[in-house]
Amino acid sequence: MHVSLVGSEMCIRDRDINGVELSGAIKNIYSMLIGASEGLSNSKAPKEIQSKFFLNTAASLIHRSISEMVEFVSHYGGKSETVYGLSGLGDLYVSAIGGRNSLMGKYLGEGYLYKDAKETFMKNITIEGAQLAIEIGPKILQDLNPKHFPLMFGILQTICENKKLEINW
């Protein structure tokens, strides 16, 4: 990795093209799961308890998501350390705290099926994580071990098979 400052902007170069591309793509899938933690916390509990439940669940999902991303990137020829950089953890953070993927995840966490949530709340909005899930989901579900990627399998089945979200830790 090479870091240089250009004007007031920081430019980071990484030679791990596979790792950068894979991390930047699959973080969209995982950010839907992290967003689901907000939907899962919408209950009859007081707001203070809901927000703490949401944040603790989100933190747990981020931790497990990074572990799965490292294994996924390594499996497909990238370097595991790339996941901890801007294209992985950095991009996951940005997408998970307020992006379109996170918003779709919130609806999935509330119990909506993907197709219903898309049609009702996000009809003309691009959801990169869902589009990627539809494109790669069938191959991933066939080729990888669900014990190694329980979060990814859960969201892929939710999107590709239009099932209710189940998070199998």
Segment roles from a protein language model:
Residues 2, 21-22:
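Short secondary-structure boundary/capping segments
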